[in-house]
């Protein structure tokens, strides 16, 4: 399975129930094709950077998931045929560095410290511990 991020913008004219049903529909598409949604961000109604199909606002939704590459074509096809989707993007994370960034984004969305941050904190702790030991040996030798 590969790592992906998708974001779509829905028309602002939809009512809350319609928005929820569209979001659930796309989540089901991912899970029905054996994908695993790690986390998602419901960003809500926001101003668009520029007007799209005569709309100045849109409802943003982001999902981070793992899936087989064959499923992405179907997801994109379903985005295209839905008139309520103003824009969409699917981003694939391939390299080791990109996958680490994907994990950091998922952790941030879940409000957890990222893997990279944990590694950094561990090395800082080890460095400070060694510095304290060095100071204590210096004071004992005097």
From Swiss-Prot:
InterPro entries: Ribosomal_bS6, Ribosomal_bS6_CS, Ribosomal_bS6_sf, Ribosomal_S6_plastid/chlpt, Transl_elong_EF1B/ribsomal_bS6. The keyword Transferase does not apply. SUPFAM superfamilies: Ribosomal protein S6. GO terms for molecular function: small ribosomal subunit rRNA binding; structural constituent of ribosome. GO terms for cellular component: cytosolic small ribosomal subunit. Gene3D superfamilies: 3.30.70.60. The keyword rRNA-binding applies. It comes from the Bacteria. One of its GO terms (biological process) is translation. Keywords: Ribonucleoprotein, Ribosomal protein, RNA-binding, rRNA-binding. Residues 110-142 are annotated as: Disordered. It holds the Pfam family Ribosomal_S6. Binds together with bS18 to 16S ribosomal RNA. HAMAP family: Ribosomal_bS6. Belongs to the bacterial ribosomal protein bS6 family. This is Small ribosomal subunit protein bS6. It comes from Helicobacter pylori (strain G27). The lineage of its organism: Bacteria, Pseudomonadati, Campylobacterota, Epsilonproteobacteria, Campylobacterales.
């Amino acid at each position: 399975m590969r790592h992906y991020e998708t974001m779509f913008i829905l028309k602002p004219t939809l009512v809350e129930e319609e928005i929820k049903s569209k979001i659930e529909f796309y989540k089901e598409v991912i899970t029905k094709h054996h994908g695993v949604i790690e986390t998602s961000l419901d960003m809500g109604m926001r101003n668009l950077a520029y007007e799209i199909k005569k709309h100045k606002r849109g409802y943003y939704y982001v999902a981070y998931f793992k899936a087989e590459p064959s499923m992405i074509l179907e997801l994109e096809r379903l985005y295209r045929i839905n008139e309520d989707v103003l824009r969409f993007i699917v981003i694939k994370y391939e390299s080791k560095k990109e996958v680490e960034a994907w994990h950091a984004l998922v952790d941030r969305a879940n409000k957890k410290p990222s893997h990279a941050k944990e590694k950094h904190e561990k090395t800082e702790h080890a460095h400070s511990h060694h510095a304290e030991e060095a100071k204590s040996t210096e004071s004992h030798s005097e």
